Structure formats: C-alpha cells, structure tokens
Amino acid sequence: MLKSLNARAVSLVTWGIEHSEELGLLTEKHPTGATLIDLGIKAKGGIAAGRFMTEVCLAGLGKTSVTTMSYEDVALPSIHVETDFPALATLGSQFAGWQIKTSDYFAMGSGPARAIALKPKELYQKIDFSEKSENAVLVLEADHYPTEEAVKYVAEECETTPSKIYTLVAPTSSMAGSVQISGRIVESGIHRLTELGFDPKKILYGCGYAPIAPIHPRAAKAMGRTNDAIAYGGVTFYSVDSDDDTKLKELVHRAPSSASKDYGRPFYEVFKAASFDFYKIDPGLFAPATFAVTNIRTGVTHASGKINPTLLKQTMQLVPA
C-alpha cells in the first residue's frame, strides 16, 4: 500500500531543507509555527528548486527532468514529467484547486494538503480518494508569504495545528515558479480529459514536456507566458484503459488547446480582453498543445493538436540577435 501523499511530500520537503543551499531555498519558522520554504520571493531559487517544487506538488509520485527541446526553429529549456500514478499525483495533489482566501491574503494552493481538506470535493469524488494526515504540505503560487490568518485557515481546513503545516511558496515571475507551472503539463491534460467526461481512474500512465517560460518581471505577463508554454508548446502522452475507443477518439479530438475558441492569441491578450476574469475565458484553452492517448485494450493511439512555434516566439519575445 502506498504511503500517504502528505507523508511522501514531507519526506521530500525534509530532503529539500537538508539541501537548501544547493536548491537555493530559504527555510524559516512562520510566526504560527508552520515551516515556510521560500523558493523565489527572497530566495534565489532556480531550475533545481522548480523541479523540487514540482515533485513535491506531485507528492513524490512523479519524476522530472530538464533538457532542451526544439520547437521547429526554436530551442527552449523544457521540463519533462512522468508518473505511473496519474490521477492521484496530478488531480489528487498537483492540481491548483484550492483558493487560499482570507481577509489579508490570496493565493492558489496545490499539493497533497488538498487531499485532506478535499479542495475541491467534486474532484476527489471523481478519483475516489481522501486522506487523513497530521502533517500537511501545501504549495502556493504567490508573491508574498502567507499571513498568520492564512496559515491558521489552512490548518483548520486540514484539521491539524499550524506547526504541522509545511508551506512552499514561489511567485510566477520567478525561475522556480516558471518551472513548476510548466511542470503541470501532464496534470493539465488529465484535467482536460476529466472535464470532457473521461474517467481519470482509467488513465494508467502519463508523461509530457513543455517549454520553461522566460521570466517576466510583471506578474500578469509572467502568468501569460507560463500558460502559453503549455497551450502552445506542451506535449502529452497517456496510456488508458477504455472500453469505448470511438468515444475516446472523440474526446482526444476535443482535448487540445487548439480546439478552444480563445486559441490563437497570447494568453495575456485573452486575459486582458476578458477584463482579467478567468471565468470569462474558455476552459478549453487551459490544455496542452498536443495529446497522444494509447488505449491498451485496442493498441490504438489517438493523437490531436499541434505545437505553435509562432505563438511561443511571440509570447516569449524571442528576438533574433
């Protein structure tokens, strides 16, 4: 039987604290007693910190590596992610599905603490999973450390004390932040297939890669680039067990970002046109550029989508020397 998600993540976090100098992390005790790990606010962070953050988000049930990939005539650093526990690692842990919202703080939360608090409950019902754990590991995309009120809220939702909370935090406009968002490539595809009606428990294996967006000092621009990295450069592969190959083919056809009505412009432009309201954006845009899904019952691989180097160059402001 697998060790609990939070127990696995605590083991990783403990290792990270021991190697904080190599990873460029800063660790301190929060006023509430929680353990705070900074990967890019005051800390230097970096690519290794981003990989570490990604693997903590996956609760140790996925592996990452960074290499350079060619997107037609453009070569970009890219993160590769793989997992043999796709639904549990991604939807059960990595998915940024918890809004940490108090009177003095806001951030999107991911990581295995979600499995204790069941955020969101409907998603955990789909994967038939929940967890009880004294320790809780939460990853925040934020420009500021969580406030005392925010940490106490998390502890209350996880039915534990603040001293048992481990919080990792990095801004989108940091190297670690950019790496870990591109590191959601496999998760974004699984979430999209799930939203289209596929049972995530039937996904047996997942891997993929996406370019790591160059850092932009403006948070909104950085967020746009990181979303574009997945939507216009993200490549995914899955093995599934489906008894309906015709339906699977239809779902895969609808899954890539190119099927979205908002496809074809940098995300920042789409976001701005939507008055910076995520809920006005077609959910189909939050998907990888390509899918390849093999049905182990038939041996058929259904493929869809396309890489868009032109949009990648535009959003990342790649200017020839």
Segments the model singles out, each with a brief description of its role:
Residues M1-C158, S163-E187, H191, E195-A321:
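Anaerobic metallocofactor- and corrinoid-dependent redox/one-carbon enzyme cores
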